[in-house]
Amino acid sequence: MDIGSGTGGTGLHARKHHKGSAHHQGEDTDDSHPQSPHRRRMTVILPSVVNAKNRKRRLDSIFETWGPNARAIYVVHNVSEFPQADQHALVSEKSQPEDPYSYPQILLVPPTIGIDDGLPRLNYVIRTVYEKVNPDFAFFVNDHTYVIPEHLCKYLEDKHPEEHMYHGHAMKNQKDVFNSGAAGYVLSRKTMQSLVQKWDQEDPTCLLKNGAKWLQGNPGLVTTKCLKEVLHVEAVDTRYHGKYHRFHAFPLTRIVSGAVDDWYKKKHEDMDKLMKTDKSYNNLDSGVGCCAQDTISFHYVGYLESRALFSTREALIENPHMTDHELKSLMIAKWPKDFKDIGGYSRGLPKEKSKDDWEPLLTVMRRISSRHTQREC
């Protein structure tokens, strides 16, 4: 996929032209930011704790779909997790990529940090991204997340890297507000720099050296506590027009149908009081009201669903006049059908004759596949 005119790199393989790119807008992406467009933002992909045995398939799928355009950096404990990157795209304690314009890259965690050491791993990753990659913004997700990088670029158009930023899908944990790691969250350069400074100072709120097992599995909660109590940086309402969510912790089919877990719904109750937003945040809309046109992420998206969602969006961007019948037929042809391929946390497409279920799904699919929301950065 093309990541912008004149950017200089060819990636791991010859990139496919991305139909949703700024070329449709006639934009010159080279002048969109005073720095190299390669450094405007990165997407950092941490290991998902769900269905770890299929991780390599998910990484391969991300590489073949949205990963290169998102400037994906895979966090790995061993280079064998994604051997395609090889040495030329390796970020580690002792090396940087020979070709900084090649994506995905891999960020190799040192052997002193184990697979279950979530806290030191997240700290190491944020530090390494800040010190060795130094993007304006970094979007932190895991390998079950599906990202629409052009929409992330659109969202960041009016944001500034030297201002604090902790943006994602805000939810509550008792009386604290945090951003879902599943839906992903964006940190600005200033915020990453401030976190690293607090770790270097061994601030007791920010640097938990012996965190409990539960916190090792949820390290973002410690980051949130540091951001709020020490740096005074809080999660914010990132919905479009204060109504439509951009970052989603469930896949498209479950978000549209409203078939999300009860725990997820409860984490939105009374959010208007905790985050000083309006009461509409307390309830998750389903159907056509579920998703912003510039939706940035979905979660629990398996490797086959990732390919299906990517190819469907590409087809709609290329041919926005596709009929509903054609779009429905395309989705049925592309989407995984067997439970083992869909995954336990996702859902398949509606039954073919279920008009009431298909209508909102087709509407949302069109909404998130508009040429008008595609940006490069």
Task: Describe the function of each predicted region.
Residues 58-63, 86-91, 99-103, 120-123, ...:
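Short coil/turn segments at secondary-structure boundaries
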Residues 2-20, 24-54:
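N-proximal low-complexity "stem/linker" segments adjacent to membrane-targeting elements
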